[in-house]
Amino acid sequence: MTIAALSVEAPRKGITLLGTGDCLHTAWQKEIRTCTSIDEGTFELNGTRFILSAEVEDNHRVHHLLYFPSFSAADAYKEAIKTKSKNLETDGRPNVDMNGVELASLAKDVEALIGPAHGFTPWTAIYAYHPSLQSCYGDMTPYISFIELGLSADTDYADTIEELHRLTFLTNSDCHSPHPVRLAREFTRFEVHDATFSEIKKAILRVGGNKPVLNVGLPPQEGKYNESACISCFTHYTLEEAMKRRWKCSCGKRIKKGVKDRIGEIASFKQPRHPPHRPPYVYLIPLSEIIAKALGQHTPFTQSVTKRWDELIAAFGSEITVLLDADLEQVARVTVPAITTAIQAFRDHKVRIVPGGGGKYGTIELPTDDDRAIPVSLGPRNSQTSLLDY
């Protein structure tokens, strides 16, 4: 994982700008500084833009996402937390012995944006530990402008919670590899004048005409913690079954509460109520996963999957184009029939998802009678199928 590798792979996925991640770590800062500086908070390498971002864990194991306007702001934040963290120089996501109020207050001091990371996951998210934003951020709650939804949630899930209606929803994915399966599994499209920190900040705050215009992400059923399930054997349970079992699986291991069940507990409404500013949400499944399923591969990381992925990207430019916009007759000239058929199934909303849970990702299935597979609408709410329409 290097900034250089990310800068090359991002455009092949169709991404213009990435958060650097880990910008409080000295070694990673050196990587970032190999980029050309566009302004204090924006950097570029191989045509890909970067803004300074980091994730920190507080003393309740809640993860917070930060965006910094400059290296000096990031350094000032690092200086403020260094006596409260034992792994600031050894871990990209440091553990900080401070609470959400303190971390948000320090962010405000350096004019950084801060909000909950992967807000609903059962181990290290705000709603795993807290019942509300106020419980976490206290008198700093008005300063919180966004929540990152995480892979196991979407706009429909989150907009059942009234206190989130004022926030901007970010659909990001904290890639641990520049491999196309992991990079930009989710992303947010913004209406901005330029791809810079200041313009992105305005878009997150929804000021000056800047705003998010599209959230793109996995179907939440594909997330590792969508349903309540055992963390060892991955047997799925309803909330009622898990509670009766006192969250202990028949195999003896722990049942972990799923995002769907947790949101059901804290929801204000049974059905989502979207505020006027909320943009559409489009579901995408990584092209590598679709190729793997079409080829009968057990993993999208095989050489044969990568070869077919590379052929399609070479022909059409980016993964998004292949999935949504490329003419299927042209796709058929580039790849094997099974892959063309699978892409057609995706576009026709016929791909099905076996939900994830307990730490195991959900899996996609091509049209099947399997009772465990549930059909998921994989297009925008208004049935437009091209991201270019946004």
Regions found by a protein language model. Name each.
Residues 1-59, 351-352, 364, 373, ...:
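An N-terminally biased module of ancient metal coordination in phosphate/nucleic-acid-related enzymes
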Residues 22, 66, 114, 147, ...:
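Divalent metal-coordination and catalytic microenvironments
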Residues 23, 119, 151, 173-175:
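Active-site metal-binding loops of divalent metal-dependent hydrolases
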Residues 29-145:
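Extended substrate/RNA-proximal surfaces in nucleic-acid metabolism proteins
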Residues 166-182:
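Short acidic/histidine-rich active-site segments
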Residues 209-282:
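Cys/His-rich short segments
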Residues 291-390:
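Low-complexity, acidic/Ser/Thr- and charged residue-rich accessory regions of DNA metabolism proteins
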